[in-house]
From Swiss-Prot:
Protein known as: Translational regulator CsrA
Function in brief: A translational regulator that binds mRNA to regulate translation initiation and/or mRNA stability. Usually binds in the 5'-UTR at or near the Shine-Dalgarno sequence preventing ribosome-binding, thus repressing translation. Its main target seems to be the major flagellin gene, while its function is anatagonized by FliW.
GO cellular component term, pick one: cytosol
Organism encoding this protein: Desulfitobacterium hafniense (strain DSM 10664 / DCB-2)
Similarity comment: family membership: Belongs to the CsrA/RsmA family.
Biological process terms in GO annotation: bacterial-type flagellum organization; mRNA catabolic process; negative regulation of translational initiation; regulation of bacterial-type flagellum assembly; regulation of carbohydrate metabolic process
Domain of life per record: Bacteria
UniProt KW Cell cycle keyword: no
InterPro entries assigned: CsrA, CsrA_sf
Presence of keyword Repressor: yes
Annotated keywords: Bacterial flagellum biogenesis, Cytoplasm, Repressor, RNA-binding, Translation regulation
Length: 77
């Protein structure tokens, strides 16, 4: 992990195609702009955590017996 100190107007360059700029600092809030290619998904931390939790819940393992029954039902049709 890299920890950096930046002032308003200063930027951080990640790789060749991502630029993070500190736009404003007010109290304990920092306003950033992120310039990155469209194919790179950018999420706030709490949104990313919610997506990860939803994906984990959606990845429920099926009982193998249920899959076998489904296969047999499809073959009988």
């Amino acid at each position: 992990m890299l920890a950096l100190t930046r002032k308003a107007g200063e930027r951080i360059v990640i790789g060749d195609n991502i630029v993070v700029t500190v736009v404003a600092i007010k109290g304990d809030s920092i306003r950033l702009t992120i310039d990155a290619p469209k194919e790179i998904k950018i999420y706030r931390g709490e949104i990313y955590d919610a997506i990860a939790a939803e994906n984990k819940e959606a990845a429920v393992l099926m009982d193998l017996a249920e899959l076998t029954a489904l296969k047999e039902f499809h073959i009988k049709k």
